[in-house]
Amino acid sequence: MTVFEALHEIGGVLKYGIPEFRLPNKIVDVEIDGLRKMGVRFEKDCIVGKTISYDDLHADGFKGVFVASGAGLPNFMNIPGENFVGVMSSNEYLTRVNLMDAANPESDTPVLQGKKVAVIGGGNTAMDSVRTARRLGAERAMIVYRRSEEEMPARLEEVKHAKEEGVEFLTLHNPIEYIGCLLYTSDAADDLI
């Protein structure tokens, strides 16, 4: 059996979507090693349908193909300002922090480490994102959720941990627009802040 992994790191959402503080990578690595010992092979940086086709797999002797496409694409709200620098999906944020060293300002793709961070949503991914932002130095981090706290899909334990870490909760609210501004300096004429 061969697993074709699209990313450069094996483990899927367990590695790129769940922060280390909630699921340590070494635990995921133990599971991956167990699969290897059972004979499972892993090929990284391989997108079935792009890097390798179904016909290629069939020609290579694969008798069956199971498509496990992983976490779905994020849902965007389609409101003005979604494309501003610093506004991103939790999927992108967590992937960049977890796999691309984006918490390091010297990395090739650093994330803005805002002092004030708002995460829109009430699920486990939102809790992971807001708690990650706190760990990256956000002095004020808040969850903005359109329903009540009791209606949040996040596990109660995740909400509890977020509160213990100082996360604020603004429920029964939903953004209708993200507002940004341009800061002009003599060095960079069009840096969005």
Where are these regions (language model features)?
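Rossmann-like dinucleotide/flavin-binding elements
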Residues: 1-5, 43-58, 69-76, 92-156
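Rossmann-like dinucleotide-binding cores of NAD(P)H-dependent redox enzymes
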Residues: 3, 7-37, 42, 130-177
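Hydrophobic pocket-lining residues within nucleotide cofactor-binding pockets
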Residues: 10, 47-48, 188-189
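Conserved acidic residues
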Residues: 63, 85, 115
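A short, gly/pro- and small-residue-rich
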Residues: 79-93
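Short acidic-glycine loop/turn motifs at beta-strand connectors
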Residues: 83, 178-182
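Single conserved hydrophobic/aromatic residue that forms the stacking wall/gate
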Residues: 184-193
